[in-house]
């Protein structure tokens, strides 16, 4: 006897998983989509061979959208949590599993949280992530205009005082997120992350760069600064606060604001964010790693 209807998005609903080999081609696709070309991904590393990017399976929760609520008009990725427990070598076979772990309402939006677990061939948990997706609460016909437009990010209420606590800065390059990068990261299908017309159909004026790309940029910054300390114990809790549009220039930033003891190691806590060329913040939150 089934307790829930097959189309219910309930906490505890299993969204399935897969077995996947982390191939060099998959890593090349990641590099093309993000611009993150760390030398460890293709050549020698402290572990003796190529290491996959920490977020190489960045969009595992999006392999099926059956966890989405029916009203997808104006839906947004609003928060991303990630824990990295062990490095993954290129060529490894992994097993994934996704499950809905939370559902809640705030103001005019309803949120669904999908957790992805990734295990290696020995059964070891190598990463856990939680993706918070928000959906407009249906309330009659769609309003005229866009759900989110470019002027929204200039609203004084959407300024975020990150980077003002001092601390050791972590610099990273800015890069333009081209439409080709969007297709490599979020394609090959036509959708609002790869095609302007598809974006307009969902209430946006232009291509909406997939939020996971900015999350990957923060992970790139943390990997370059902390190396194996991020790949063996990295954490991120990031909120996506403004839309990154196709062809915008962006980059991650960080400041080490605290160091805490963790066993025999030290864990630096980083105030992390992504910003556009004009200083508009698109992602804000915290990240940490182990100092090895």
State where each predicted segment sits.
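Hot-dog-fold acyl-thioester-processing enzymes
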Residues: 1-79, 140-232
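A conserved acidic, glycine/proline-rich C-terminal tail/linker
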Residues: 233-237
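Short, glycine/charge-rich beta-strand/loop segments that flank catalytic centers
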Residues: 45-48, 116, 238
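HotDog/MaoC-like acyl-thioester-processing domains
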Residues: 1-10, 79, 84-169, 240, ...
């Amino acid at each position: 006897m089934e307790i829930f209807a097959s189309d219910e998005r309930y906490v505890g609903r299993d969204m399935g998983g897969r077995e996947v080999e982390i191939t060099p081609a998959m890593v090349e696709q990641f590099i093309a989509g993000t611009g993150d070309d760390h030398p460890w991904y293709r050549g020698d590393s402290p572990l003796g061979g190529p290491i996959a990017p920490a977020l190489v399976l960045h969009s595992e929760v999006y392999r099926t959208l059956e966890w989405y609520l029916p009203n997808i008009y104006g839906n947004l990725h609003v928060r991303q949590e990630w824990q990295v427990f062990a490095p993954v070598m290129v060529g490894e076979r992994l097993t994934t599993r996704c499950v809905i772990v939370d559902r809640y309402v705030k103001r005019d939006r309803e949120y669904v949280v999908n957790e992805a677990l990734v295990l290696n061939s020995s059964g070891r948990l190598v990463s856990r992530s939680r993706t918070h997706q928000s959906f407009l609460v249906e309330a009659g016909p769609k309003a005229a205009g866009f759900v989110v437009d470019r002027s929204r990010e200039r609203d004084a209420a959407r300024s975020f005082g990150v980077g003002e606590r001092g601390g050791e800065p972590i610099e990273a390059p800015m890069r333009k997120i081209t439409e080709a990068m969007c297709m490599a990261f979020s394609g090959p299908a036509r959708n609002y992350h790869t095609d302007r017309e598809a974006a307009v159909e969902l209430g946006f004026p232009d291509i909406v760069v997939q939020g996971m790309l900015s999350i990957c940029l923060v992970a790139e910054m943390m990997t370059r600064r902390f190396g194996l300390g991020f790949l063996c114990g990295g954490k991120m809790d990031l909120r996506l606060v403004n839309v990154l549009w196709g062809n915008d220039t962006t980059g991650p930033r960080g400041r080490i604001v605290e160091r805490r003891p963790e066993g025999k190691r030290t864990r630096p806590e980083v105030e992390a964010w992504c910003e556009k060329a004009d200083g508009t913040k698109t992602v804000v939150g915290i990240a940490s790693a182990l100092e090895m």
